[in-house]
From Swiss-Prot:
Top-level taxonomy: Bacteria, Pseudomonadati, Campylobacterota, Epsilonproteobacteria, Campylobacterales
Record protein name field: NADH-quinone oxidoreductase subunit B
Subunit organization: NDH-1 is composed of 14 different subunits. Subunits NuoB, C, D, E, F, and G constitute the peripheral sector of the complex.
EC numbers on record: 7.1.1.-
HAMAP family tied to this protein: NDH1_NuoB
Function statement: NDH-1 shuttles electrons from NADH, via FMN and iron-sulfur (Fe-S) centers, to quinones in the respiratory chain. The immediate electron acceptor for the enzyme in this species is believed to be ubiquinone. Couples the redox reaction to proton translocation (for every two electrons transferred, four hydrogen ions are translocated across the cytoplasmic membrane), and thus conserves the redox energy in a proton gradient.
Record Pfam families: Oxidored_q6
Major enzyme class: translocase
């Protein structure tokens, strides 16, 4: 072997190539988030307002989709009832991997002021949540900031991550 050649087999392969591919995939995923708009209550009004031209989520690569099979991000906005929990879990399971969840508003985060027998006390009891947005009802700027935080989180993760499925706990 010549002096200017590097023995990659002795060093464990080509980490530069894998790192570059990983960063490329992370960049593509973080800049093309297709969100499932899943509004359940008052926070859905703010989520709809975020789709207006004033906030322009398209410039960040976020496009709202109606089908879970075409979405990577589920934005749950509003109060989740126990009857609706199974349907929410089914929608989450229909989303392709990798998938992320944003819980928007106090009702989605903790059940809000409705501590009744029919309300789920937080979406994280049904599906794993990546970003929590506090407030009642949070402004569209807050949702925009949460999507930017999710983009940063995606860039830090490995491009080939997979989550283990969780059981439905009510």
């Amino acid at each position: 072997m010549a002096k200017h050649q590097i023995n990659y087999a002795a060093n464990g392969g080509l980490p530069v190539v894998l790192t570059t591919v990983d960063k490329l995939v992370q960049w593509g995923r973080s800049n093309s988030l297709w969100a499932l708009s899943y509004g359940l209550a008052c926070c859905a009004i703010e989520m709809m307002a975020s789709g207006a031209s004033r906030y322009d989520f398209d410039r960040f690569g976020t496009i709202f989709r109606a089908s879970p099979r075409h979405s990577e991000v589920m934005i749950i906005a509003g109060t989740l009832t126990k009857k609706h929990a199974e349907f929410t879990r089914r929608l989450y399971d229909q989303m392709p991997e990798p998938k992320w969840v944003i819980s928007m508003g106090s009702c989605a985060n903790t059940g809000g002021m409705f501590n009744t027998y029919s309300t789920v006390q937080g979406v994280d009891r049904i599906i794993p949540v990546d970003i929590y947005i506090p407030g009642c009802a949070p402004r569209p700027e807050t949702l925009q900031y949460a999507l930017m935080m999710l983009q940063k989180k995606i860039r830090k993760q490995s491009a080939f991550r997979a989550q283990k499925p969780r059981k439905l706990e009510i």
